[in-house]
């Protein structure tokens, strides 16, 4: 059973302490202010949402999420393979079973925050991931283009090409219409705190020294928000991909596609 939950951050002082800004070069911010708490560090959010699930240390992540803010209130849509705890000191949780009735040819409006990367091999044949928008920018600059419009257009086209590639759409079981909105391109550079690293060591100890994937103190990734329309070609592929997540990065608010039906006369 899968669950789609709306998780709202409580306006409490403890919640503010949990989500203090921890991006590199943070701007000063008072924890005692009356402003709605801001979740400035996706790593902290990701760790906090883990607390909604009763799982032993070292377990696979059972959820995807996407952060929104409306009227000064921060909330998350969380898609999970386990039912979240409804009683949490930092969150108000509304959970319901996720069992959509998709059909071939169905048209859906979608929103997705993704990590658009491609794998390239170096001279030694070693493959590594690269941000497709940054690759497009560097390519334009290497060709002598320095005007913002041309570079922005090349980056936009790269973002569209990434999500509408035939191989990707076939893998996801959809056709994505190329008339897309792209926004909020962000390069994230996050630091794990000393406390986070100590917790990782404690988790490894609790697993009787069973190896846990090593995690660097610095986390770097990019994200891009997509909004548009798609048509389902393979129900099982699409449904399974929704549960797994879209794109390489499926943590830190990436990978969750939110959809709603489109009327037949909508584009």
List the predicted regions and their residue ranges.
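RNA-interacting cores
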Residues: 1-267
């Amino acid at each position: 059973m899968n669950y789609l939950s709306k998780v709202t951050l409580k306006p409490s002082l403890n919640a503010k302490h949990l989500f203090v800004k921890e991006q590199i070069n943070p701007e000063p911010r008072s924890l005692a202010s009356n402003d709605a708490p801001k979740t400035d560090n996706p790593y902290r959010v990701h760790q906090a949402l883990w607390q909604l699930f009763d799982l032993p240390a070292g377990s696979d992540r059972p959820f995807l999420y996407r952060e929104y803010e409306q009227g000064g209130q921060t909330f998350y849509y969380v898609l999970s393979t386990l039912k979240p705890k409804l009683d949490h000191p930092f969150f108000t949780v509304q959970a319901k079973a996720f069992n959509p009735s998709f059909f071939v040819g169905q048209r859906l409006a979608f929103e997705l925050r993704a990590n658009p990367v491609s794998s390239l091999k170096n001279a030694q044949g070693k493959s590594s991931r690269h941000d497709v928008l940054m690759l497009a920018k560097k390519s334009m600059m290497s060709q002598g283009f320095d005007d913002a419009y041309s570079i922005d257009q090349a980056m936009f086209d790269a973002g569209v090409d990434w999500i509408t590639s035939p191989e990707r759409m076939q893998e996801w079981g959809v056709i994505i219409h190329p008339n897309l909105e792209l926004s909020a391109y962000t390069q994230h550079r996050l630091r794990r705190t000393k406390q986070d690293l100590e917790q990782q060591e404690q988790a490894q100890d609790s697993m009787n020294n069973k190896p846990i994937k090593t995690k660097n103190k610095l986390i770097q990734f990019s994200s891009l928000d997509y909004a548009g329309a798609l048509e389902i070609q393979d129900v099982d592929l699409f449904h399974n991909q929704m549960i797994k997540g879209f794109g390489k990065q499926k943590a830190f608010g990436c990978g969750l596609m939110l959809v709603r039906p489109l009327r037949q006369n909508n584009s």
